[in-house]
């Protein structure tokens, strides 16, 4: 197999380095091994490809793309087929813009109303969230573009997200906080899963054997790549050991030096590095093949889809005095600045 032959040729240093990003949005390219880079970007409800100065908050300019309603709206449709259409449309735009991995969808449970990223998540209902996430994934992956199911797991608040500790008994964890991810992994089959910032029961998600090895890979049968949220890697040695494959965004080699020493002194098997490098390469070559094909993209059709999704996601909570639907000949007043 091509990937195995490449891994055999690579130095240990290069294999370790491959598993960290080259910059904010790309993996490392190694011409001497025939390894291209992979470009990824945010995209739960629309592509956000930054070609110049990159930043996590999206403050700098991005290439134009269709802005679909966020998951908080599309969940109101209760329509997996609609989410599959949106996923497919974002996948087509990703191909047209040279993006091999879309960082979405988000499947975290809405627990805290103060969570600033609730708009990225579908629902308080883990079953609904899982079904819609799976549909989005199927739609995008059918275009040959990878997806990243996030943020795994129990990342339901933003306050102190880098240091917080989600303490959960096993039943609560599995019945509520893991259910959406389990459905999405088994039914959607995403190319990647993104691990979250916080600790889960005292262990950082990027270091968690229980989460990444025992549950995700062994119980659920996930065979894809695990990527960190940006800056979420805690212990790179333990990350390799438990199957946390790609550390993003990269840019620093201090963790790589620790891994190199750990392999040399025998505390980390080199096979752990090989396994992660293999999963990174599999995704890189899949994306390269997809992006080598010409991609046509009908943005007007996507705008129409976005409008339909917004309408289908709108939910009427109260119709006081039967005012809706509006009478055809009635007059209305629109007041205020536009």
Residue map of PLM features:
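Glycoside hydrolase catalytic-domain context in secreted enzymes
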Residues: 1-338
């Amino acid at each position: 197999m091509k990937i195995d032959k490449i891994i055999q040729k690579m130095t240990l240093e290069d294999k370790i380095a491959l598993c960290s990003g080259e910059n904010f949005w790309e993996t490392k390219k190694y011409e001497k091994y025939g390894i291209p880079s992979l470009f990824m970007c945010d995209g739960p409800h629309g592509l956000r490809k930054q070609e110049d100065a990159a930043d996590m908050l999206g403050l700098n300019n991005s290439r134009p793309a269709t802005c679909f309603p966020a998951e908080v709206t599309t969940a109101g449709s209760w329509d997996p087929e609609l989410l599959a259409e949106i996923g497919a449309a974002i996948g087509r735009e990703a191909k047209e813009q040279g993006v091999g991995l879309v960082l979405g969808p988000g499947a975290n449970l809405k627990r805290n109303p103060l969570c600033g990223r609730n708009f990225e998540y579908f629902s308080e209902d883990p079953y609904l969230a899982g079904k819609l996430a799976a549909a989005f994934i199927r739609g995008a992956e059918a275009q040959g573009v990878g997806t990243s199911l996030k943020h795994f797991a129990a990342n339901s608040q933003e306050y102190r997200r880098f240091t917080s500790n989600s303490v959960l008994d096993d039943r609560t964890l599995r019945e509520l906080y893991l259910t959406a991810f389990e459905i999405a992994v088994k039914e959607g089959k995403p190319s990647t899963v993104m691990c979250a910032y916080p600790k889960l029961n005292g262990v950082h998600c990027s270091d968690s054997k229980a989460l990444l090895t025992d549950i995700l890979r062994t119980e659920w049968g996930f065979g894809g790549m695990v990527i960190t949220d940006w800056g979420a890697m805690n212990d790179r040695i333990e990350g390799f050991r438990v199957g946390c494959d790609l550390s993003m965004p990269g840019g620093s080699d201090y963790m790589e030096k620790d891994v190199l020493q750990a392999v040399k002194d025998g505390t980390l098997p080199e096979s752990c590095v090989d396994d992660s490098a293999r999963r990174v390469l599999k995704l890189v070559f899949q994306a390269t093949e997809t992006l080598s094909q010409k991609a046509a993209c009908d943005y007007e059709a996507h705008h129409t889809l976005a409008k339909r999704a917004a309408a289908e996601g709108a939910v009427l909570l109260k119709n006081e005095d039967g005012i809706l639907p509006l009478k055809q000949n009635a007059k209305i007043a629109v007041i205020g600045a536009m």
